[in-house]
């Protein structure tokens, strides 16, 4: 009995490792699902657009085209039928023969042209936006030109005070010359007058003495 007891716990660890292997096996399955190609609707529209039959493409011919593109038709048979019905309801495909998924299908030219027109409008809008951005550039050039005008005006203001200072100096210099000349003349006249007055007084005194 003592020998059989340790054997039971030794068998337990392999049972715990088994779930880890199952989890590792599940991960690749998830990766395969993500790596699936484009949706069925896109493949159907491409196959119908590639066909040159005027009456439309039958379901059998459609399946052959999808199988040639590498799509598993047998597993995704129900998806193909649902994709056809949804494309017909959206107006992308037109059913020329039969009802439901069984019949012939043709690409709707109006729907294809309607999809092309919005793309053309977007391209036209993008072109219209570009000239608006180009028109903004000249505004920057005018802004850069304004400092030049301001720089030209400043020297003119500096020249006017200099010219005014020159005229003031010219006007002041003649006034000084006029003031100095009369002063010299007055001093000369004052010096001459006393000399002339003294002899007259002396003559008068001599005449008075003679009369006595």
UniProtKB/Swiss-Prot annotation:
The modification N6-acetyllysine is found at residue 17. The modification N6-crotonyllysine is found at residues 34, 64, 85, 90, 97, 159, 168. GO terms for cellular component: euchromatin; nucleosome; nucleus. The modification N6-methyllysine is found at residues 34, 186. Residues 36-109 form the H15 domain. Disruption phenotype: No visible phenotype. Triple-deficient mice (H1-2, H1-3 and H1-4) die by midgestation with a broad range of defects. These embryos have about 50% of the normal ratio of H1 to nucleosomes, demonstrating that critical levels of total H1 histones are essential for mouse embryogenesis. H1 histones are progressively phosphorylated during the cell cycle, becoming maximally phosphorylated during late G2 phase and M phase, and being dephosphorylated sharply thereafter. Crotonylation (Kcr) is specifically present in male germ cells and marks testis-specific genes in post-meiotic cells, including X-linked genes that escape sex chromosome inactivation in haploid cells. Crotonylation marks active promoters and enhancers and confers resistance to transcriptional repressors. It is also associated with post-meiotically activated genes on autosomes. The modification N6-(beta-hydroxybutyryl)lysine is found at residues 34, 52, 64, 85, 90, 106. Belongs to the histone H1/H5 family. Interacts with TSC22D1 isoform 2. This is Histone H1.2. It comes from Mus musculus. The gene is H1-2.
């Amino acid at each position: 009995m003592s020998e059989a007891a340790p054997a039971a716990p030794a068998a337990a660890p392999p049972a715990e490792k088994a779930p880890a292997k199952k989890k590792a096996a599940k991960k690749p399955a998830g990766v395969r699902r993500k790596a699936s190609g484009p949706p069925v609707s896109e493949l159907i529209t491409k196959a119908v657009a590639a066909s040159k039959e005027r009456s439309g493409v039958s379901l059998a011919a459609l399946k052959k085209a999808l199988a040639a593109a590498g799509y598993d038709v047998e597993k995704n048979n129900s998806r193909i039928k649902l994709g056809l019905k949804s494309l017909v309801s959206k107006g992308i495909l037109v059913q020329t023969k039969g009802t439901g998924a069984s019949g012939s299908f043709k690409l709707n030219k109006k729907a294809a042209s309607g999809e092309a027109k919005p793309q053309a409008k977007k391209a036209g809008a993008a072109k219209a936006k570009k000239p608006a951005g180009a028109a903004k550039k000249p505004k920057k050039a005018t802004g850069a030109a304004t400092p030049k005008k301001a720089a030209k005006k400043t020297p003119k203001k500096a020249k006017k005070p200099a010219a005014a200072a020159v005229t003031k100096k010219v006007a002041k210099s003649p006034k000084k010359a006029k003031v100095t000349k009369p002063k010299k003349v007055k001093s000369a006249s004052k010096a001459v007058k006393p000399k002339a007055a003294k002899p007259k007084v002396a003559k008068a005194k001599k005449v008075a003495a003679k009369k006595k």
